[in-house]
């Protein structure tokens, strides 16, 4: 449980968010145990997204939560390597191709800035208001996001 749920890495690729100061630390032991029971058939791996997509089999559902797209030229370096606008396009096109070749249902969450990219590829777009607990300018209001969906192709 790091400060406000923030995920950040230094230039060496090491996680560098403080835990914060809490009078009582919440450790969700029961939720973790329930997840472990439900995830017995899940494969959890740490791979580049291209390698992950190469493991997708017919009938698998795919959910992607990439670093959120900003305006071109905006901050993209959440890790020691950044996820650029070109990477966003490459991922969206690869997901569309996977859906067309294998029929897998695809779901992607992203910022409102990615709406046109996914809509132009034929994804069904759902706009949502997502709560924020972190903000660079101190504004912790909700933000517009999208859930982009390609249904299973039979």
Model-found features: residue ranges?
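Short active-site-adjacent structural elements
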Residues: 72, 115-118, 134-137
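Short, surface-exposed loop/helix-turn segments at secondary-structure junctions
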Residues: 75-83
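Class I S-adenosyl-L-methionine
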Residues: 123-154
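Short amphipathic alpha-helix initiation/capping segments at coil-to-helix junctions
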Residues: 84-91, 141
């Amino acid at each position: 449980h790091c400060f406000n749920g923030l995920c950040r890495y230094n230039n060496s690729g090491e996680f560098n968010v403080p835990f914060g100061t809490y009078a009582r630390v919440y450790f969700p032991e029961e939720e973790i145990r329930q997840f472990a029971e439900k995830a017995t058939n899940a494969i959890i791996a740490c791979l580049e997204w291209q390698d992950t997509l190469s493991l997708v089999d017919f009938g698998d559902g795919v959910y992607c939560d990439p670093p959120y797209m900003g305006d071109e030229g905006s901050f993209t370096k959440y890790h020691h390597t950044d996820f650029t606008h070109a990477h966003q396009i490459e991922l969206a096109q690869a997901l569309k191709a996977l859906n067309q070749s294998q029929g897998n249902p695809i779901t992607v969450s992203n910022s409102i800035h990615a709406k046109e990219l996914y809509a132009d590829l034929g994804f069904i777009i759902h706009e949502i208001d997502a709560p924020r607990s972190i903000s660079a300018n101190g504004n912790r209001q909700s933000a517009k996001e999208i859930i982009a969906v390609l249904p299973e192709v039979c």
